[in-house]
Every structure is written in C-alpha cells, then in structure tokens.
Swiss-Prot record:
PTM annotation (Phosphoserine): residues: 179, 302
Up-regulation conditions: Up-regulated in myotonic dystrophy pathophysiology (DM).
Post-translational changes noted in the entry: Phosphorylated. Its phosphorylation status increases in senescent cells.
Protein name as annotated: CUGBP Elav-like family member 1
Originating organism: Homo sapiens (Human)
Binding partners and assembly: Component of an EIF2 complex at least composed of CELF1/CUGBP1, CALR, CALR3, EIF2S1, EIF2S2, HSP90B1 and HSPA5. Associates with polysomes. Interacts with HNRNPH1; the interaction in RNA-dependent. Interacts with PARN.
Gene3D superfamilies on file: 3.30.70.330
Domain remarks: RRM1 and RRM2 domains preferentially target UGU(U/G)-rich mRNA elements.
Molecular functions (GO terms): BRE binding; mRNA 3'-UTR binding; mRNA binding; mRNA regulatory element binding translation repressor activity; pre-mRNA binding; RNA binding
Positions carrying Phosphothreonine: 4
Entry-linked SUPFAM superfamilies: RNA-binding domain, RBD (SSF54928)
Length: 486
C-alpha cells in the first residue's frame, strides 16, 4: 500500500500509536516513512531526539501512527523481531506505545473453541453482539478454507469480553462438537513464548525418558546448563501465574506437586553450583547418611505409587540439566538432596564456602517461594523431632553458633523460623519474640545451632534473603562477655 492513496485527515478511532526501536540514528522521518508505508498510509512519524546535543541527534527510536489499526498490526507482524535495518545488530522492536497499553487488543480478544464448523463469521457476531460492540470477528480456517471449529472475537473494551466469558463459557454444546463451547481470553505473546519454552523442554526431556537414575546415567550427559535455566525461567513464570499444569506435563515431572517442583529446581541449582568446584563436590558426597534423608520420606522405588514420580528420579533429571551427571551415583544424587536439609558440620567442613554459595544461588533463583519450599524433601521424622525440641526454645548453642534474626514477617512463628533455618544444620532452638502487651511478633528472633559452621552457612545464605516485602538481617548474637547490646 502506498501513503499517497486517499485517506481521511485523521486516523481511525481505533488506530494504534506504535513505538519502534532499533532504528539507525542516521535515518530521518522521510526514510522511516518509506519503510512503513509499505504496510499502509502513515499519519504521523515522530523521531525521538536527544535535545542535549546541538543539533539534536536521533536516539534510534521513533513513534509511528498509521491511519488504520490493520496497517499498524501488519507492520508489527512483518517487522518486529524480523527485520534488521542497515547498520544495526538487532531486529526492529515494534510494539504499541505505553499510552496504548491500557486498552491493548490482547486484553479484549477472546478465543472461542468448540463451535460448529457450519458457523460463519456472521453467526458468531450475532451470538456475541449482545455483550457489546465487536471490533473484529474471525473464524480460523485451514488451507482448504474449511472452518477449524474455533474463532477469535475482539470487543472494544475488556469489560465486554469478561461479560461474554461469564455468560458463554461452557453454556452450550454446538452441533458436531464433543464438548461445550470454550470462551476465554486469547493467548498473549507472553503465553505463546511460555508454551514454546515448554515444548523445547518436552523435547529435551524425551531424550532422557528411557534412562533410569538407578542405572545408567551416562546417557543423560547430552543436556547442558542452558536447559536448567530454561526450566527455572518457565517455573518462575508459571508459578507467578498459578498455572503449574504446564510443568506437570513434562517427563519426569508429571507426578510432582507445585512445592516438589519448586524444591527440585532449587536443589538442582545448588548442586550445579557446588559441582563446579572440587570442594563443592566433596560437600555433596560427604554429607552423613544422605540417602536415608530421601528414602525415609517415601522416596524409595518401592514406595512410589503408580501415579507419582520418584523424587530421586526427578532430582536426577534436574541434576542432568545442570550438566553435572558425569561420575554420579545414587549416593551423590542423594548428597545433592542433603543441601536441602541434611547438611551438618561434616558436610560443610569439606567445602563450606562453595556450598554456601550454592545454597545462596539456589535461594535467589526462586526467591519468591524458596522459604515456603524448604521443608518438603526433609526427613520428616527428623523434622518432627527437631520441631518438638527446638521450636519456641531459648537454649543456646556453643560460642559462634547463635544467631539474631531481624525483619521477620509479622506472621512468622517459632515453627516457621525453625523450618527456615533447618537446612543449614542441627537447630537446638528457634524463638520469635512476642510483645507481651499485644501478643504480636516483634519481628525478630534467635536461632541457635550445635556448631558455628552451620551458623556461618545460615548467615551467608539467609542474610538479605527476601520474604515478601522484607529482607532478613541475620548476624551472630554477641558473646555474653561482650558488654555491647545485641
């Protein structure tokens, strides 16, 4: 289309103002107009310039407004992440300007599934017109031109779209359909990218589906750390959206619940970091009785139910993704699990620094739910025994093993404090201080270990750790012989 064609003086009411980045700084409005008018008549182009320079220089980006929404979307589909302009290293970035986001198409666009293949666009319009003004209606068709039994409907406001969902979703079963009509918001670009990531993971997981953690691990070495990063990214996105079904479909994650998936991701990150140094490997393989920590929690092969996945197998798959399978055996896999609850003074003494770094890295990778996820793979008997004796107690450990924790969440109790600091060693006491007048937490407390090494591990990993809107401050409690206050 050429910009010289007849057009009104003003753009359409639904026209979109687009922001365009990765534009050569030497390009003028005229150069840009020639580029954009291939897709439709251009109403206005505004190059962003640095006014501090004389004369003002282009910042390499601009705003463009087409006369029609259709032209803007066609330009975006053809240029965004697709075309690299002369002299640039990255493709054009083209998206609606911030001022357009409040009424973005993706917020008003519905996907309609399970519709009769006999329906036309007009039939769909009639069906949904009672909920508000329809901006666009399109039935998806195959190469043969026949309907695929689904459509997209875009309303002029999000409220109209929400009303349509409430009224029409699963409200009727149409002719030739096996289940009720599906009405939901169409996938956004972010949703599509998330599904693409899940597909990539699924393909990689298929490579290891025939391998057994109890047998030959050599076949798992084909995967690298980038797939662990991909998994963590997908986990974070799905956790924030509350949709962990995507992960549940991945082998061998299918039988794990959300908390188990989160724990395994943290453990794999910790093991990957620790395995990169000799001392870290020692810390993994020398933890006392690590296999019992897993097997006593129902993780042995014989105790796995038919509808669940062995946590050790899942752990092995994640360790594989971290590129750390060379020379591993069942003991070393269990040793990695010990990072999440079995580390005592013997494990830390053979690689304290690197293990602390590994734990810190694991926590920071999934910080929004790490604190809640800590106890899941612990030896439950050990957890119960420690809980009875340590929660609420003010018993002190040896010199250098007693911690003062500030900035605890208001709702944290003794048990929460205990569970949060158990991964670093044997806790002899954990106490949150309560205001006697209000009976509410003072948001600080004490934790004591049976050895100073565990206390140092807790400080390095948990000092600055964010829980909600708060960052913990963890430091050693001062000696009784020190006259200074806490």
């Amino acid at each position: 289309m050429n910009g010289t064609l007849d057009h009104p003086d003003q753009p359409d009411l639904d026209a979109i103002k687009m922001f365009v980045g990765q534009v050569p700084r030497t390009w003028s409005e005229k150069d840009l107009r020639e580029l954009f008018e291939q897709y439709g008549a251009v109403y206005e182009i505004n190059v962003l310039r640095d006014r501090s320079q004389n004369p003002p220089q282009s910042k390499g980006c601009c705003f463009v407004t087409f006369y029609t929404r259709k032209a803007a979307l066609e330009a975006q589909n053809a240029l965004h992440n697709m075309k690299v302009l002369p002299g640039m290293h990255h493709p054009i970035q083209m998206k609606p300007a911030d001022s357009e986001k409040n009424n973005a198409v993706e917020d008003r666009k519905l996907f309609i599934g399970m519709i009769s293949k006999k329906c036309t666009e007009n039939d769909i319009r009639v069906m949904f017109s009672s909920f508000g003004q329809i901006e666009e209606c399109r039935i998806l068709r195959g190469p043969d031109g026949l309907s695929r039994g689904c459509a997209f409907v875009t309303f002029t406001t999000r409220a109209m779209a929400q009303t349509a969902i409430k009224a029409m979703h699963q409200a009727q079963t149409m002719e030739g359909c096996s289940s009720p009509m599906v009405v939901k918001f169409a996938d956004t670009q972010k949703d599509k990218e998330q599904k693409r990531m899940a597909q990539q993971l699924q393909q990689q997981m298929q490579q290891i589906s025939a391998a057994s953690v109890w047998g030959n691990l050599a076949g798992l070495n084909t995967l690298g750390p980038q797939y662990l990063a991909l998994y963590l990214q997908l986990l974070q996105q799905t956790a924030s959206s509350g949709n962990l079904n995507t992960l549940s479909s991945l082998h061998p994650m299918g039988g794990l619940n959300a908390m188990q998936l989160q724990n395994l991701a943290a453990l794999a990150a910790a093991a990957s970091a620790a395995q990169n140094t000799p001392s870290g490997t020692n810390a993994l393989t020398t933890s006392s009785s690590p296999l019992s920590v897993l097997t006593s929690s129902g993780s042995s092969p014989s105790s796995s139910s038919s509808n669940s996945v062995n946590p050790i197998a899942s752990l092995g798959a994640l360790q594989t993704l971290a590129g750390a399978t060379a020379g591993l055996n069942v003991g070393s896999l269990a040793g990695m699990a010990a990072l999440n609850g079995g580390l005592g003074s013997s494990g830390l003494s053979n690689g304290t620094g690197s293990t602390m770094e590994a734990l810190t890295q694991a926590y920071s990778g999934i910080q929004q739910y790490a604190a809640a996820a800590l106890p899941t793979l612990y030896n439950q008997n050990l957890l119960t025994q420690q809980s009875i004796g340590a929660a609420g107690s003010q018993k002190e450990g040896p010199e250098g093993a007693n911690l003062f924790i500030y900035h605890l969440p208001q709702e944290f109790g003794d048990q929460d404090l205990l569970q949060m600091f158990m991964p670093f060693g044997n806790v002899v006491s954990a106490k949150v201080f309560i205001d006697k007048q209000t009976n509410l937490s003072k948001c600080f407390g004490f934790v004591s270990y049976d050895n100073p090494v565990s206390a140092q591990a807790a400080i390095q990993s948990m000092n600055g750790f964010q829980i909600g809107m708060k960052r913990l401050k963890v430091q050693l409690k001062r000696s009784k012989n020190d006259s200074k206050p806490y």
